Amino acid sequence: GLWSTIKQKGKEAAIAAAKAAGKAALNAASEAL
């Protein structure tokens, strides 16, 4: 249904945001070295 689609999109967005945050943290850490 519509609600499960919304939940799926939200989960995908959360995963994408977490990956982006992790990548940014890695970049910041490598530049700090």
Curated annotation (Swiss-Prot):
Residue list for modification Leucine amide: L33
Biological processes, Gene Ontology terms: defense response to bacterium
Family: Belongs to the frog skin active peptide (FSAP) family. Dermaseptin subfamily.
Entry keyword set: Amidation, Amphibian defense peptide, Antibiotic, Antimicrobial, Secreted
Source species, domain of life: Eukaryota
Cited function: Has antiparasitic activity against trypomastigote form of T.cruzi (IC(50)=0.25 uM) in vitro but not against L.infantum. Probably acts by permeabilizing cell membranes. In vitro, shows no cytotoxicity against macrophages. Has antibacterial activity.
Subcellular location: Secreted
Provenance organism: Pithecopus nordestinus
Tissues expressed in: Expressed by the skin glands.
Protein name, per record: Dermaseptin-4
Taxonomic classification: Eukaryota, Metazoa, Chordata, Craniata, Vertebrata
Cellular component GO terms, alphabetical: extracellular region
